[in-house]
């Protein structure tokens, strides 16, 4: 079994490379052009930033890790809650739909998924800025140069109690797998976009959808603990954490202390902090 698992993970590594490389190349081209004309913080281009190799490593590690974590936790939860144990039976169960959410049109399920998970992630995000949880989230905040590549920098513990947990809860609640197939890439695009070095505020939609400037204030060294929303700033407006002063952009980022470079070093960093 261990050999089969090793083969599966190895194969998934190459599959991930096959999918991620065109994505990185495309995003690199798009944001190189856009940030050349409208940079939020002029300076070194993204391909010369410190920690470039570590950023790229996260783009390989995170998809593989979250894929197997979602599969394992979904199988465990389905067996515990619905008493379904066979892999094919589990797949059929979710494809056929269940519960009242599963009876809704897919577009309604999609809206429900976006709103509920964004609200939950807002509070999860706030919790990761507190106490012992911060050292795991600090991995994401460590770069002093925030770029689109920074979007994938997340510690496994942060992922587990963030997007992975939200996805599994919504799947168990009855949201169709087809919704995840469509909105998974959408969420990745939004996350990549808001980390880009662009002086874009969203204009008249700045209170409706997140923007690069909105999220850069979240990464700023001052003020701290602002703009936690992943997609809809309404949560920050409702709970007093919205911060986008007109005509201003943040200049300094990071956590104010050294973060070891390299994927493995950062994965063990919270255990030593």
Where are these regions (language model features)?
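Transmembrane alpha-helical segments that form the membrane-embedded catalytic/substrate-channel core
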Residues: 28-37, 115-130, 185-201, 211-217
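Long, highly hydrophobic alpha-helical transmembrane signal-anchor segments
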Residues: 1-10, 73-105, 176
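Membrane-embedded alpha-helical segments that form the functional core of polytopic membrane enzymes
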Residues: 99-126, 133, 181
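Transmembrane helix interruption/hinge and helix-loop junction motifs
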Residues: 172-180
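Membrane-interface helix/loop boundary segments of multi-pass membrane proteins
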Residues: 129-139
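Cytosolic/stromal cytosol-facing helical appendages immediately following the last transmembrane segment
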Residues: 1-21, 25, 133, 142-153, ...
């Amino acid at each position: 079994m261990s050999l089969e698992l090793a083969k599966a993970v190895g194969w998934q590594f190459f599959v991930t490379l096959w999918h991620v490389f065109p994505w990185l190349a495309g995003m690199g081209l798009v944001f190189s052009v856009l940030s050349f004309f409208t940079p939020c913080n002029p300076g070194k281009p993204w391909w010369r930033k410190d920690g470039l190799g570590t950023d790229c490593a996260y783009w390989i590690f995170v998809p593989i890790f979250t894929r197997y974590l979602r599969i394992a936790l979904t199988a465990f939860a389905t067996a515990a809650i619905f008493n379904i144990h066979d892999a094919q039976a589990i797949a059929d169960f979710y494809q056929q739909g269940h519960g009242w959410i599963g009876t809704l049109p897919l577009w309604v399920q999609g809206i429900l998924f976006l709103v509920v998970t964004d609200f939950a992630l807002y509070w999860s995000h706030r919790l990761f800025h507190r106490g012992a949880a911060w050292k795991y989230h600090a991995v994401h905040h460590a770069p002093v140069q925030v770029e689109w590549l920074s979007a994938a920098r997340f510690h496994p513990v942060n992922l587990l109690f963030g997007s992975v947990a939200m996805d599994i809860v919504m799947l168990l609640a009855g949201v169709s797998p087809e919704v995840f197939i469509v909105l998974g890439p959408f969420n990745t695009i939004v996350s990549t976009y808001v980390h880009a070095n662009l002086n874009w505020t969203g204009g008249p939609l700045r209170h409706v959808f997140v923007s690069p400037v909105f999220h850069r204030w979240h990464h700023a060294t001052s003020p701290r603990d602002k703009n936690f929303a992943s997609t809809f700033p309404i949560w920050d407006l409702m709970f007093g954490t919205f911060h986008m002063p007109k005509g201003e952009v943040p200049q300094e980022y990071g956590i104010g202390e050294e973060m070891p470079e390299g994927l493995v070093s950062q994965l063990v960093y919270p255990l030593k902090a």
